[in-house]
Amino acid sequence: MTYNPRDHYFRKAKQENFAARSVFKLEEIDQKFKMFKPGQVVLDLGASPGSWSQYASKMAGEKGRVLGVDLSPVTVKLKNAVFIQADLRDLNLEDIFKEHGFVPPFDIVMSDMAPKTTGIRMTDQARSMELCELALDVARRFLKKDGHFVCKLFHSDDFGKLRDEMKKTFAKVEAVKPDSTRKISKEIFLVGLSKK
């Protein structure tokens, strides 16, 4: 099967006015685990181009809020969302929350962060793992009790270690490869449900 950048999910995203096809990965995960509810406050790490924030914004509704952080700009406009263009590692999150009127803890912390790929599998996997560990650290600090966490990473030999690490923080941890993920992709999503 050849790679088609304009596949069914790409076209569907355009038809439904989502910034990217990745929205359907999050939607599938949510349909499986029922994480999103009206009125939630959501932290979106690696928010660009904005499709995960669009989904979270829609599900959280007018009483909910979304804070997105990414190195790249997010151009979608959402009434209940704020976007910060910065490297997460350089931010004092407490200051950012205060500046934009967010009061942790968050109901959901989600990360679609991905490293700039080098084409060297082990390097890309290690960088992806580092980003997921960074997101997990943020979730441990700012996610409410019983809150949920979703993180994308490239599958590697260290995958099991990260899953075990998440089990210390969450009542249930699941690994998911949504149908909307390209077949050739090494992406997998770790879902942490009900923070202890």
Swiss-Prot record:
GO terms, molecular function: rRNA (uridine-2'-O-)-methyltransferase activity
Matches recorded under InterPro entries: RNA_methyltr_RlmE, RNA_MeTrfase_FtsJ_dom, rRNA-MeTfrase_E, SAM-dependent_MTases_sf
Keyword S-adenosyl-L-methionine attached: yes
Active site: 152 (proton acceptor)
Ranges annotated as spanning the membrane: none
Cellular component terms (Gene Ontology): cytoplasm
Function: Specifically methylates the uridine in position 2552 of 23S rRNA at the 2'-O position of the ribose in the fully assembled 50S ribosomal subunit.
Protein name as catalogued: Ribosomal RNA large subunit methyltransferase E
Organism: Bdellovibrio bacteriovorus (strain ATCC 15356 / DSM 50701 / NCIMB 9529 / HD100)
Origin organism lineage: Bacteria, Pseudomonadati, Bdellovibrionota, Bdellovibrionia, Bdellovibrionales
Encoding gene (name): rlmE
